[in-house]
């Protein structure tokens, strides 16, 4: 004898299952599918309002732009992160490290944060201490990012066409760092070895060997740079290390062990390559940027005063020459007049 469930029975079973918690997949399969006609009871006003909600004609569906590299890998994301950091960071120091442990990195970052927090903030300037970071980078990917920033200009990419939701063609520019234009620009630029060696990348490329760490500053602040050098690469008397009495944690064995494995090899400041001496010069600017501006103003004023004195000296010398010539001519004429005057007196 076969059991057959009528439609009302099935509906009743479905409502019973909906009201209770479904604990198995077989019970879930017993729930009948809901008809789409149940959702067609919207009011005419809502339908009219929905008709006005339409996409603009120039809307391009969000699709992945064409790329020369796989975009879903960690290497691609690191490349885009490094290129963005290179374009937005005006001051960057490059270090080579030798197998520092996590505890040593933590100790070094602790002392670095302490030294940076003691730097006085100029009046009216933001505090950049919390935005100064010391991080380890992937050397090979960072090298590619540096080449991309150096040899690829996104503004030179000509726009192409993209299909909108309505099927029309609109101009679109694919100039991201993973695009084929970036790959071709880097490939063409690196063919000429002699030209590459004269660029900033050619000067920094020999430093990107082995494990690399970078210190990034969001602005060119000689005061913060000097504080960082006193911790990471001290060189007295310009950048002496903190005293043991003032900062005993700096002389902790873990911190000192990590600092011995850290070597400053160069830097990139305002898009230019700097060696160790150049970095020390920037960090030694007195009173920071304001002091540099004062030196520049003084130099310009001195040059202007020198030019004014030179021009005035030429005019004065010409005037003295003319005056001396006039006096000579007067003396040549005055003796005759004096002789005539004496004769008149004798008469």
From Swiss-Prot:
The keyword Mitochondrion applies. Gene3D superfamilies: 3.30.70.1730. Residues 55-74, 325-347 are annotated as: Disordered. Its main location: mitochondrion. InterPro entries: Ribosomal_uL10-like_sf, Ribosomal_uL10_bac_type. GO terms for cellular component: mitochondrial large ribosomal subunit. The keyword Mitochondrion applies. It is found in: Mitochondrion. Keywords: Mitochondrion. GO terms for biological process: translation. One of its GO terms (molecular function) is structural constituent of ribosome. Belongs to the universal ribosomal protein uL10 family. Component of the mitochondrial large ribosomal subunit (mt-LSU). Mature N.crassa 74S mitochondrial ribosomes consist of a small (37S) and a large (54S) subunit. The 37S small subunit contains a 16S ribosomal RNA (16S mt-rRNA) and 32 different proteins. The 54S large subunit contains a 23S rRNA (23S mt-rRNA) and 42 different proteins. Component of the mitochondrial ribosome (mitoribosome), a dedicated translation machinery responsible for the synthesis of mitochondrial genome-encoded proteins, including at least some of the essential transmembrane subunits of the mitochondrial respiratory chain. The mitoribosomes are attached to the mitochondrial inner membrane and translation products are cotranslationally integrated into the membrane. This is Large ribosomal subunit protein uL10m.
